[in-house]
Swiss-Prot record:
GO biological process, one term: bacterial-type flagellum-dependent cell motility
Entries under HAMAP family matching the protein: FlgI
First and last residue of the signal peptide: 1-22
Organism: Pseudomonas syringae pv. tomato (strain ATCC BAA-871 / DC3000)
The protein's name in its UniProt record: Flagellar P-ring protein
Superkingdom, taxonomy of origin: Bacteria
Classification of source organism: Bacteria, Pseudomonadati, Pseudomonadota, Gammaproteobacteria, Pseudomonadales
Cellular component GO terms, alphabetical: bacterial-type flagellum basal body, distal rod, P ring; outer membrane-bounded periplasmic space
Alphabetical list of PANTHER family matching this protein: FLAGELLAR P-RING PERIPLASMIC PROTEIN FLGI (PTHR30381), FLAGELLAR P-RING PROTEIN (PTHR30381:SF0)
Length: 369
């Protein structure tokens, strides 16, 4: 324990010596096997103000309700399949079970309507078992919903909807009943998985750990994983990881990328994007068609009829932009400044970047999402 305390003190001293670009190891990597697990359940929300499922269109809601009543010894008469339960809705319940969650702890849950319920506002979720992918029950959910949206409708058909009223959350709405087995304390090694695979970052993580703890303690498995030796004692292993996760490492620079969202017009250009020598010009043609009909009025005694004569005007306007030139190794700042000078819109910038990529002048990955 004394040695571990000395290592912690040394870690703090090393961390203080790094520059502003260094990041904690806990922020750029995770421990293999230490992760959250998804849970899901099916249940009923009751207490709705007439905004529940229309059970004639969602028969599974009525079936679920009848099954619940039968568990309390209440037998529903035959032929009640047309009963309308306006205050009940069938819902899906899901949550993330954190790593090392213990029985008795609570987790937040999300509740979403499955049927045609208009709103879950004001409802309460009845006891719902939540299962993992293995089919075992790991938590029990129940509680009053918090719904951020609402829905209102008038008799004349007018309607207003704010946000999504058919989904809500219950903070701390599920109680953990079973822990998920973890291999955290098994074996004499641990694997650190980088959030973003990068060979440079993996090498720097290995170098930093070995610099602090000694040669051979850490070994890179590939560009995304680093294996480190660890104590077998659980308490010492926790102290050991506390040291590692507070190490500050300077991550490697990301690959040059340009991200384009064609639906929203969003363009993100990475810091390392450069352009080879190229000349670019971009203009747009605007065609305007206007209708200005003329009324033809005949003379008083001519016997003719008044007629409307269509008259169309077509105008084409070409916006001319000067050609701008990119020199060798042009940086992001120079690209943005040059494009802004010609007044290019986001759509124009997309076309320019795509053309530069096709010409082989854009030294980056062009990703369209």
């Amino acid at each position: 324990m004394i040695k571990l305390k000395q290592l912690i003190a040394a870690t703090l001293l090393l961390s203080a010596a790094f520059g502003a670009h260094a990041e904690r190891l806990k922020d750029i990597a995770s421990i293999s096997g230490v992760r959250a697990n998804q849970l899901i359940g099916y249940g009923l929300v009751v207490g709705l103000n007439g905004t529940g499922d229309q059970t004639t269109q969602t028969p599974f809601t009525l079936q679920t309700f009848n099954n619940m009543l039968s568990q309390f010894g209440i037998k529903v008469p035959a032929g009640s399949g047309t009963v309308q339960l306006k205050n009940v809705a069938a819902v899906a319940v899901y949550a993330d079970l954190p790593a090392f969650a213990k029985p008795g702890q609570t987790v937040d849950i999300t509740v979403s309507s499955i049927g045609n319920s208009k709103s879950l506002r004001g409802g309460a979720l009845l006891m719902t078992p939540m299962k993992g992918v293995d089919g075992n029950v790991y938590a029990i959910a129940q509680g009053n919903l918090v719904v951020g949206g609402f829905d209102a409708e008038g008799r004349d058909g007018s309607k207003i909807t704010v946000n999504v009223p058919s989904s809500g959350r219950i903070p701390g709405g599920a109680s953990v009943e079973r822990s998920v087995p973890s291999g955290f304390n098994q074996g004499n090694t641990l694997t650190l998985n980088l959030n973003r695979s990068d060979f440079t970052t993996a090498k720097r993580v290995v170098d930093k750990i070995n610099e602090l703890l000694g040669p051979g303690v850490a070994q890179a498995l590939d560009g995304g994983s680093v294996r480190v030796t660890a104590p077998l004692d659980p308490g010492q292993r926790v102290d050991y990881l506390s040291i590692l996760e507070n190490l500050e490492v300077d991550p490697g620079q990301t690959a040059a990328k340009v991200i384009i969202n064609s639906r929203t017009g969003t363009i993100v250009i990475g810091q390392n994007v450069k352009v080879s020598p190229a000349a670019v010009t971009h203009g747009s043609l605007t065609v305007t068609i206007t209708e200005d009909p003329i009324v033809s009025q005949p003379g008083a005694l001519s016997g003719g009829q008044t007629a409307v004569v269509p008259r169309s005007r077509v105008n084409a306007q070409q916006e001319l932009h000067p050609m701008f030139k990119f020199g060798p190794g042009t940086t992001l700042d120079e690209i943005v400044r040059a494009v802004n000078q010609v007044g290019a819109a986001p759509g124009d910038l997309m076309a320019i970047l795509e053309a530069l990529k096709q010409a082989g002048a854009l030294q980056a990955d062009l990703i369209v999402i």
